[in-house]
């Protein structure tokens, strides 16, 4: 299992110049296990993301068929250090605990514009802006998608000082 994260903001288009982080399954925390801030950097940033679970094997998937290749969505958090010098992407994105995954919800139970709340901050997300089908097509050009893989189509920016509780409303 691997986690493929497209490095783009919510409203940015997907093109051949967008970066992709490949995150190993060892970086994932799930099932309510605690997260501890690592001590190898002083400052950390957190990105809320919607993660999509791949449900079938595929390679070179056309955008019009991409919806057949994922079956569930979860709210997740990507953790990365704030760095001012060039450093290996693996160190900043693939360490143990870099990806915190919530409970999976069947994709058909999610409405068109889910709302994500973090503490007292909230944002509505247009699923059209996520470009999940475009992300599946783009990623499958370079990677074989396997059952259980996770795709993160975009970062979701919510200004908040401390993440205390996260909820997806609209399922």
Q: Which role does the model predict for each range below?
A:
Residues 1-150, 157-171:
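Catalytic-core "active-site belt" of small-molecule-metabolizing enzymes
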